[in-house]
Amino acid sequence: MAKFEAHLKCSFCGKSQEQVRKLIAGPGVYICDECIDLCNEILDEELLENPSKVKDGNDSKIPTSASTVSKPAPTLSSIPKPIEIKSFLDNQVVGQEDAKKILSVAVYNHYKRLAWQGSETNEIDLHTTKLHKSNILLIGPTGSGKTLLAQTLAELLDVPFAVADATTLTEAGYVGEDVENILLRLLQKSDMDVELAQRGIIYIDEIDKIARKSENPSITRDVSGEGVQQALLKMLEGTIANVPPQGGRKHPYQDSIQIDTSQILFICGGAFVGLEDIVQKRLGRNSIGFMTNDNRGKSRKSNDLPKNQVLNNLEPDDLVRYGLIPEFIGRMPVSAVLEPLDVDALEAILQEPRDAVIKQFITLMSMDNVKLTFEENAIKSIAKEAFRRKTGARALRGIVEELMLELMYKLPSQDEIKNCSVTQAMVEAITGGKIVPLPPSDKRATKESA
């Protein structure tokens, strides 16, 4: 053993143990005190050239809020009022008036709470009262605008925004993603700025897919249902979470970043297919024994409700019957129901929002010096086809992509064509499974397709 120790040497400079004052051993590697001093000099020179790389603490591998210049915390005067928030949402999202009002008030109160904790409110002696955050649950069919609402809010408030898919989450120790990976996405959107991430918004999509399989507590392990709900509880309520910067499963021995989730606004969304039936069943449940005229009238009234209005009578017990645990529902005190989009709403979505699908394609074609127009009847036909496909606003882009394929393929090569009009006949041909060929160029300045 003594013979082996005599031949120890620095893995970097090659000097033996006898030639240096100190030789520090690591897993299969050695470094001497001289190389350590040299490393320190290199780091000091780099920090002098670029002071923004200075980090708090001794561990420079862990990103902290001091690694970049954080945006200032919101102040009461800088937070848009609920009416202003809704007005901004109106520019991006068509319809869903009730949901937009609920979101506007909830988001305003959340960021007012953050500002209340800052210096601007120190003049008001209200700090004896602790304000708790109110996370939001969005319930609505696919393509009704749940994700878009959350994205638009984050854009308005200029805060980091991350989207997570609840279907990929599992309990710790099982194949899948840990719930802490949700926070990692937000941290990455914040350029690893912890302070900025702690004021962000997280949207968890498909939250209805982690409902437990039955109303009763599960006897066996439900690692992607009730187990995930249990794992999310503390994060939703507010806790100091340890987030692995490279993901927890593949790098188990890395250092963690601590994030306080008490200031992060969580918005959960899901389609909750079948929830209407649960509400309808509760509303129309017959009384035991003889029915009075009052009860008979209420039962008849509940059965006459249109399907899109049934969820307006939603109660927490209905969500429990669907499969969410009471503790999870309690941490989502604000809920908003989004209505299914009808043909008129889909028609408006095609044209009115700032980033409407038709506006996008008009811009694309203008880059080829072609003025693109859509006839009114063509727009109505697109909306009707999207309604028939039952995937909400998401169907609109797919239909227009199909419609524009032949035009976008040939028009860039036909410089003489400066105008192009999309007609109802073109839409009906596409929706009927046919492809309308683009006529060969005849040197006209305007081309009408029919």
From Swiss-Prot:
Annotated positions binding Zn(2+): C10, C13, C32, C35
A GO CC annotation given for this chain: HslUV protease complex
Highest taxon above the source species: Bacteria
Stored InterPro entries: AAA+_ATPase, ATP-dep_Clp_protease_ClpX, ATPase_AAA_core, Clp_ATPase_C, Clp_protease_ATP-bd_su_ClpX, ClpX_bact, P-loop_NTPase, Znf_CppX_C4
Sequence positions that bind ATP: P141, T142, G143, S144, G145, K146, T147, L148
Pfam families per UniProt: AAA_2, ClpB_D2-small, zf-C4_ClpX
GO MF annotations, alphabetized: ATP binding; ATP hydrolysis activity; ATP-dependent protein folding chaperone; protein dimerization activity; unfolded protein binding; zinc ion binding
Polar residues composition-biased segments: 61-75
PANTHER family on file: ATP-DEPENDENT CLP PROTEASE ATP-BINDING SUBUNIT CLPX-LIKE, MITOCHONDRIAL, ATP-DEPENDENT CLP PROTEASE ATP-BINDING SUBUNIT CLPX-LIKE, MITOCHONDRIAL-RELATED
Listed HAMAP family: ClpX
Protein name: ATP-dependent Clp protease ATP-binding subunit ClpX
Native source species: Prochlorococcus marinus (strain SARG / CCMP1375 / SS120)
Originating gene: clpX
